[in-house]
Amino acid sequence: NQQQLDIKAEIDDFMEKVFPNEELREYMWDHAASTLIGENINQKFIIYTGVGGNGKSIWVDLINLMLGDYADKINIALLTQKRKSIGGPTPEIAKLKGRRFVSMDEPSAGDELNEGIMKQMTGGDEMEGRAMYAKKMLKFVPQFELTCCTNHLFTIKSTDKGTWRRIRQVDFRAEFVDPEDYEIKKAQGLVGDKDRPIYVKDLKLKDKLPSWVEVFTAILIERVNETGGIVRDCPMVLEASKRYEEKENFWRQFINENIVKGTPDDKIKKNDIRNHFNEWYQTNYQQKPPKSSELYEQLEKNIGKQRNRAWYGYRIVYEAYDSEEEDGSD
């Protein structure tokens, strides 16, 4: 009927504004549709990023309204704390049985992701939790899409592929502002960027969401019948996720910034690279550096096997003030 068509037009308008990139928009439709199948086949942890009023919270509210009791929210501490002692009550895990969409609010700057718990929550293996005062542990296979809304990304120290293949960063690039701010930004020439559009905020949008639920659900049912719940990656999400990984992976950062291919006669001695790495790490992280054995393992993974306590065909990039040391390092 006409009312449903009008609501569909409103939803389409919302999606086009919040996700101006068409490939990303399709990705997010598929992501929302996947919550309906009751099986976590994608095994992803999707992190919604973006500063200010960009539609993140409205998007989460809409999915929560659609799913009702099948959606839940958890405390960020569940993913940032160390594992609890075995046998203690874990009601925050027990309550996730049967959920289809689980969201959390942002970590504080510098909060470190507990990769083990994240893998448990996004994997296809059994989890177990015990409700408060319950005698028995509750075992279940996670069925939910795990998401987080944040301006601050987690610190992730893991370099293993099992962690990073699960993480997807979705940038919310639109901005919704008050009318007076819109006019200011317009005068500054900031309005009109298709990649990062700016719109006047709809102050009644949140009130419209309950009336959208029926049509939104119908769209997703039609969608999931086509996709089977599979969410195919899109370039924008993969690029953002790769940038995140490279920033977090200090090993890769160190190698990219400090080691370059040279002539066959060039070589990097183990002692030289260890000293250079220790200085670089302490400068950047103000902490005790990892063991030398970890450094050598990462170098073998990334630039190849050593021979005679050196890596041949590569050289260390020193800062300008270190150039004299470089000349005399051998």
Task: Label every PLM stretch briefly.
Residues 98-101, 126, 142-146:
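Loop/turn-to-beta-strand initiation segments
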